[in-house]
Each structure stands twice: as C-alpha cells, then as structure tokens.
C-alpha cells in the first residue's frame, strides 16, 4: 500500500459514531462530535502539527503544518467534516474486499442486502481495486472520514515520512455538523488564516467542484377552520386540503425526482397536520441566482393568491436562505481551480468539473471571504448501507493534495 497508515486511520475513524443531530441546539450537535474533535486534536499533535487548538465557538479543531520553504507562497487550508449523515452509525463494521473483479455481487455482511453492479454500475469502475464497504447494518462514513484520513495522511507524509518535500504553510481543520447544514455557520476565517482552501468532501476520483446550489428552506403554516364534517358545507376550511392545493400549485416537474444537471427544484420534506392546522416543510434549490429568487417569490405568490381567494390570511410562508452558489465568489479568481485541475492532470486523473446538486461547507465559507472549492475524497453511494470507497482512490486523493502543494510552490505571493 502506498500510504501504509491511510487505511488503518480510516477504519479507526469510521468505527466512531459521529452522526449529527438536526434537532440539537448545541454546537457541535452531539457530545460525540466534541469528543472526536478532541481525539483528532491529540492525533494532530502526535503527528507534529503545531498550534493545534479546539474552538469552543464552532466545534472545529485546527492545526498547522509549518512551512519549510523561504519562498513567499500562498497559505493553503484543508478542511473535512467529522460528522456522518442521518443513518445508523452505531457499530460500523467495515468490510475489506481486495482485488474486486468489477462484476461480482458483493454481499453486505449477514444481511440480505448486496452491492450488485446491475443496481450500482459504478462498481464496474473499480476492477482490481480494494474496496471498503459496510456490513449492511450501518452507513460506512466515508463521507467524510475518507477526507479526514486523507488529510491526516498528507500531514504525516509532510511532517514525518518526507519532511524534505517543499511546502508553504498549510492549515488543517476538522469540523462538525456539515450533514445537517450548519457546520460552517460559525467558521472563523480569521483564525484559519489562509489564502484559499479546499474541502476534501467530494465523491469519485477526479471530482473538482466549485459550483453549488443556492439554497433556501420554507415552512408553510396552514390555518384551517374545523367543524363537524356532517355540517361542514360552506363552513369548514380543511388545513390539510390547503396544503395539498398549495403543493399542487408548484410546478409539477420541478421536483428532485424529475430534475438533473443544472435544473433546480422544490422539494417537499415533510407534511403533517389536521383539518384545523397543517405544516409543510420545503427546500428550494437552484444554481442560477435569478431563478433561485424567482422560486422563492413564487412560493410567496401562491400563498398570497390563496389568501386572496379565501378572503383570510390562512397560508403563511416563512422562507429563509441557507447558502449560496459559491461560484459567484470563486469565479472571481479561478487560479485555485486551475491549480487543482493541473494537479490532477499531472497525475493522469481526469478532472470531473460539474455543478454540485447540493452544497458543501465551502459554500458558506466562500461567502465569508475564503474561496473554498471541493475535491474528491472517494466515497460512493454515500449516506446509507450501500456506501463504499476504493482505497486506491483515497491514495490518489492524497497524491492530488501533494501535487497541489507542489504546484503552489511555483506561485509567489
């Protein structure tokens, strides 16, 4: 194996349950994330990182790989998140399959679940590689403990294995709660103190992402007027029916299951209630700022029209922006995309530059003034029992980081 400790690190990290909790009011959202961040801090110190510190304000643990060059080069930041998605993460039992043939069905532990190339054709890309997958009872946690392990392996390489590898100052940060959308809300750009950064939180080999959705959340409250159904004519106002009418007024084809590429959508996450009162929760997504604003305006317009027809204010939307398309920031200086693209090409990796149909911590951090695109970490089928990662892809992620650092040495501030 190219990086001897990469896989052991990854296996150690995924066995720790760091599932974030969207119902929590604390930062980080769980005590387990606090404890894991402190554990990572100790590991960072053991590798030789300097100025390792935990920020109570945001749950990030930060450390520095000091420069070993006199060149005045840009300071690079590397970020990954410690939490995992909303799926069982207790008792993660990673399975290792060496020299996968690219065709066989992979049994997931003792469960009835399998990774079948007929269902997951991406498996065919991994012939001859070593895969780490689940036992079918949990997620794997490659999102984003692959990124955590890769950054730690990079640090080990620069500080201990090949300390003569020339580099400027590199800052490392591991944070909480990316999966519940609040991890970067309190990120401290001044404390991180770099010129640009990357999140190592992408998927398959070659992913290089700097364009995300712009995102908003909407909660629609529906106030009904409930009476006995036997005498309801011209009197009852059924809040659930109002919710149905509202949803049906949205564009039929602007839904996640009917869109792709750069197409945006409205997504109904939750609907509950009674004839007296109901509540619908939506997310709104689009890559283009104009269309994003039009979608938010439409949700208000539908409510206004329904209220006008009812003659009463019974439909009450609350719409809040969540994050924005970081391309608006990064396109002002594409050099950090160019250097990552060049690094991959130098390693015979084909860059995959496509808009993310989602967001990353980098979306928010970029709008705080620190451009932060996203690099591949290797995970496939993330957020569930069918998740897997290739060890060889993880190794190439470390290679890519090293090549970015090498190329950065040629850019004098």
Swiss-Prot record:
User: Per its record, how is this protein called by name?
Assistant: Peptidase T
Q: How is its activity regulated?
A: Activity is strongly inhibited in vitro by chelating agents such as EDTA and 1,10-phenanthroline as do the reducing agent dithiothreitol and the oxidizing agent N-bromosuccinimid. Phenylmethylsulfonyl fluoride, a serine protease inhibitor has no influence on the enzyme activity. On the other hand, bestatin, an aminopeptidase inhibitor strongly inhibits the enzyme activity and leupeptin, a modified tripeptide, slightly inhibits it.
Gene Ontology MF, one: tripeptide aminopeptidase activity
State the SUPFAM superfamilies in the record.
Bacterial exopeptidase dimerisation domain, Zn-dependent exopeptidases
Q: How is the cofactor bound?
A: Binds 2 Zn(2+) ions per subunit. To a lesser extent, can also use Co(2+) or Mn(2+) instead of Zn(2+).
Q: Subunit structure of this entry?
A: Homodimer.
Per its record, the protein catalyses:
Release of the N-terminal residue from a tripeptide
Instruction: Report the main location listed first in the record.
Output: cytoplasm
This entry's Enzyme Commission designation comes to: 3.4.11.4
| UniProt temperature dependence | Optimum temperature is around 44 degrees Celsius. The enzyme is stable up to 50 degrees Celsius.
Q: Where does Zn(2+) 2 bind?
A: 143, 179, 383
* Gene3D superfamilies listed in its UniProt record: 3.30.70.360, Zn peptidases
Q: What class of enzyme is it?
A: hydrolase
Q: How does activity depend on pH?
A: Optimum pH is around 8. The enzyme is stable in a pH range of 9-10.
* Binding, Zn(2+) 1: 81, 143, 201
Cellular compartment(s): Cytoplasm
Q: Looking at the record's lineage, which domain of life comes first?
A: Bacteria
To which species is this protein native? Lactococcus lactis subsp. lactis (Streptococcus lactis)
Where along the sequence do coiled-coil regions lie?
none
Specify the taxonomic lineage: Bacteria, Bacillati, Bacillota, Bacilli, Lactobacillales
Q: Which family does it belong to?
A: Belongs to the peptidase M20B family.
Active-site residues (renumbered): 83, 178
